A protein has these predicted regions:
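Glycine-rich FAD pyrophosphate-binding loop
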Residues: 84-100
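Glycine-rich loop-to-alpha-helix module at the N-terminal edge of alpha/beta enzyme cores
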Residues: 1-24
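Short hydrophobic core segments
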Residues: 66, 89, 147-155
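Residue-level detector of alpha-helix initiation sites
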Residues: 5, 69-71, 94
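Iron-sulfur (Fe-S) cluster-binding segments and ferredoxin-like electron-carrier domains
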Residues: 16-42
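N-terminal Rossmann-like dinucleotide/flavin-binding domain of flavoprotein oxidoreductases
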Residues: 1-4, 17, 36, 99-147
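Glycine-rich dinucleotide-binding loop and its adjacent helix/turn
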Residues: 40-57, 115-135, 159-181
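N-terminal Rossmann-like FAD-binding beta1-loop-alpha1 element of flavoenzymes
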Residues: 61-87
Length: 181
């Protein structure tokens, strides 16, 4: 977790480019580094044995992270680890951003994302879902609640167009919209 706050997620969605360059493949086969990382990270997801990092300091300062995708979760992890009181605001009712809404479960199981988020919760990170900053609550309002800094990690939730004939036809939706439903 020192270099990667979401190791179980990365162990599942990594495209394994390093394996194609692994010199071990010159002898027999490359190291299956993604499977190794996945195995190690899975051991840490077990609530009975997982390691919860301790805060290095206790600054007592509140920071708002806007968005709970990988950037927001990573930011929340490192800020909490350093000793800040972090609250993550997510406009959707589910945490994880595109990890949850944009990656199918056969590729990244939802319970893995939830377990990674549970570690953040045990580190003291607070989460507020169904709250769109700028609409449901404003930055000035958050400042009056004591938040001194803001990290905006709203991501890129939209699907991409392919540039093919018929993609604007009625009933055609993006892959992201399909996964959300």
């Amino acid at each position: 977790r020192k270099e990667n706050p979401l190791p179980a997620v990365c162990g599942r969605i990594c495209n394994r480019r390093c394996e194609f360059e692994c010199t071990r493949g010159d002898i027999d086969q490359p190291l299956a580094i993604d499977e190794i990382k996945k195995f190690i990270a899975d051991q840490e997801l077990d609530p009975a044995t997982r390691f919860i990092p301790q805060k290095m300091h206790d600054y007592g300062k509140k920071i708002a992270v806007i968005g709970s995708g990988p950037a927001g979760l990573s930011c929340a992890y490192y800020l909490a680890l350093d000793g800040y009181n972090v609250t993550v605001f997510e406009k959707e009712n589910r945490l994880g951003g595109m990890l949850t809404l944009g990656i199918p479960s056969f590729r990244l199981e939802k319970n893995v994302i939830e377990a990674e988020i549970d570690i953040l919760k045990e580190m003291g990170v607070m989460f507020k879902t169904g709250v769109e900053v700028g609409k449901d609550v404003t930055v000035p309002e958050l400042r009056t609640e004591g938040f001194e800094a803001f990290y905006i990690a709203i991501g890129a939730q939209g699907g991409r167009k392919l540039g093919v004939e018929g993609e604007d036809a009625q009933g055609v939706i993006s892959g992201v919209d399909f996964l959300r439903k």
